[in-house]
């Protein structure tokens, strides 16, 4: 029984899931919106929200924390160029998930996750 175990496993090991979240976050920061499955979008949304909340204050410590989550200096730089100005006065709610319907090949529910 998985009582009181928060978070989605997505049928992956811990390392695989961590790499998936990192890649989705980097893609979302670079492209502002990505098309993925609904389960992946819902799983990565809190991670992205927390990352943007960290990036709102541009301090060396915040940059180190963001880099530890992203592992991409280019994505970290891009995040810190737009996050303080765009989301400075906003407390949460930085992303939006829009359902797109089922995928043709396997019927997986697709979604668009985008930065507001």
Curated annotation (Swiss-Prot):
Keywords tagged on the record: Ribonucleoprotein, Ribosomal protein
InterPro entries in the record: Ribosomal_bL17, Ribosomal_bL17_sf
SUPFAM superfamilies: Prokaryotic ribosomal protein L17
GO biological process terms, semicolon-separated: translation
UniProt keyword rRNA-binding, yes or no: no
GO CC term, one of those recorded: cytosolic large ribosomal subunit
Disulfide bonds: none
GO MF: structural constituent of ribosome
Pfam (any one): Ribosomal_L17
HAMAP family, alphabetized: Ribosomal_bL17
Matches recorded under NCBIfam families: L17 (TIGR00059)
Family according to the record: Belongs to the bacterial ribosomal protein bL17 family.
Self-association and partners: Part of the 50S ribosomal subunit. Contacts protein L32.
Protein name: Large ribosomal subunit protein bL17
């Amino acid at each position: 029984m998985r009582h009181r175990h928060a978070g989605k496993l997505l049928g992956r090991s811990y390392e695989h899931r961590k790499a998936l979240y990192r890649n989705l976050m980097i893609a979302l920061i670079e492209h502002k919106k990505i098309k993925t499955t609904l389960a992946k979008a819902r799983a990565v949304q809190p991670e992205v929200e927390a990352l943007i909340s960290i990036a709102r204050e541009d301090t060396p410590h915040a940059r180190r924390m963001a880099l530890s989550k992203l592992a991409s200096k280019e994505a970290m730089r891009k995040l810190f160029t737009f996050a303080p100005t765009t989301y400075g006065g906003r407390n949460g709610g930085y992303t939006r998930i829009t359902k797109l319907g089922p995928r043709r090949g396997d019927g997986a529910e697709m979604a668009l996750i985008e930065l507001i």
